[in-house]
Amino acid sequence: MQFRILGPPDLFDEERRLRTPLTSPKQNRLLGALLSRPNSLVPREELVRELWAGRAPKQARSALNAHVSGLRKSVATAEGTRGARARLVTGAGGLTLRVSPTDTDGGRFCLAVSRARSRCRTAPEDAYGILREALSLWRGAVLEGVGPHGPLGAVLADRLQDVRRQALELLFDAALSTGRHADVLSELREATVTHPLCERFHDQLMLALCRSGRGGEAIGVYTEARCRLTAAHGHTPLLRARLEQIGAQSPELSAAGARTPAAFPPPRAPARRGEARPHRFMVRHIEREDGPAERSALGFLTDLLSGRELHTGGV
């Protein structure tokens, strides 16, 4: 039986493929509080604060006992009475939930991420598969549907969300190492929206765009993210280094397994008189004293790296 909290909380019987939903939001909060300190006694005072957020009823002890009994009944439905007694242990002044890491979807997720991390450099294909399976455990937000988290639930949710962010970083690294840059573009864009201050996601998106032959869009990611990230962190070393690679057309942008060999195509011969000029990435820098001027991509990069503000025209 598995305690699932990566989404709406429930108890899941893996052999019979049956889920036992908890019967009230208070039970959901209680489960989250106990899983924030697995195999450790959680004092009653903290459980009361978790369930009622400082507005506890007069008979708080009796009300808490009622919710503990309700949770124990739910566990008994999923695992039997003996299992419920072994899981939920009442101690001096508190309650303990006994679980192993594999008894919860959160624990399984963290174990899988740790296993994938050790394989990312030596076996990125394996790491990619492990991370895909691990991320599929998420059915929604942590403890979804319980309303505002109490202090313990909030700590648990923040901890698991941070591991999920790390898992996505590892997944994208594995994807970029195995030629799956085009496959993760939409997920990378979503990650930069969900985590706008995570420089790593923006850097990975720039690399994925370059390897998909969309270097101009990669520069756009830089220009959009630079001010925001600089204001938050003071500097953007990853994005600046990636921009320099684009300007130099570094081999890093076409690593083994990439399906597109370079971020920008090689220069074309000048057009003969009367022929249409080839399409180029052009930038208008309207702050120059000599008026609007069309500039090459490398000139644009020079200004970007020097920190000047630019106004771009259409590509």
Name each model feature, range by range.
Residues 82-120, 161, 243-247:
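A short linear beta-strand->loop->alpha-helix hinge motif most characteristic
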Residues 19-51, 71, 200-203:
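Short amphipathic alpha-helical recognition elements used for nucleic-acid or partner binding
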Residues 1-26, 86-94, 264-270, 278, ...:
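Short boundary/linker motifs that mark transitions into or out of structured domains
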Residues 1-3, 66-100, 232-235:
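DNA-binding patch around the recognition helix
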Residues 149-195:
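Alpha-helical adaptor scaffolds
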Residues 23-32, 57-79:
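DNA-recognition element of transcription regulators
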Residues 94, 112-151, 233:
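Short acidic-capped amphipathic helix/loop micro-motif used as an active-site/signal-coupling element
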